[in-house]
Design a protein with these regions (language model features):
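Alpha-helical cap/lid subdomain in secreted, periplasmic
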Residues: 1-118
């Protein structure tokens, strides 16, 4: 089971307790049916403030530790933080476009393959 909870919770102004609860519920549901879980971490832009930005990223790290899931710390590495970020996003500057997909695949694939190995 691959879980990627994007930054929409932050964009909607939800408290981190809600984000954490949403993530916990998804992981617990997957684990309740014995699914192996890969958690794809997300970050929010720095304009949310240093503390919130760090706390948001930490939600994924903490959930991975708590439930023993595999984790890709930041699914958009090389997309959102790279020199070509502007051309890798749709006009909304929030959602990656088709050019970003191979980079995102490269970010997730090694962890996914480890989970799928016998």
């Amino acid at each position: 089971l691959v879980i990627e909870l994007g930054a929409n919770d932050a964009l909607r102004g939800l408290p981190l307790t809600s984000t954490r609860a949403n993530l916990d519920a998804m992981i617990q549901l997957g684990q309740s049916i014995n699914a192996k879980v890969l958690l794809l971490g997300m970050q929010v832009p720095p304009n949310y403030g240093a503390r919130y930005t760090a706390d948001f990223a930490n939600v994924f790290v903490e959930a991975s530790r708590k439930y023993g899931t595999a984790l890709v710390p930041f699914f958009l590495t090389g997309v959102a933080d790279g020199p070509e970020a502007e051309r890798l996003f749709q006009r909304d500057r929030i959602h990656p476009n088709e050019l970003a997909q191979p980079i995102m695949l490269d970010n997730a694939w090694p962890s996914l393959m480890r989970l799928m190995s016998p």
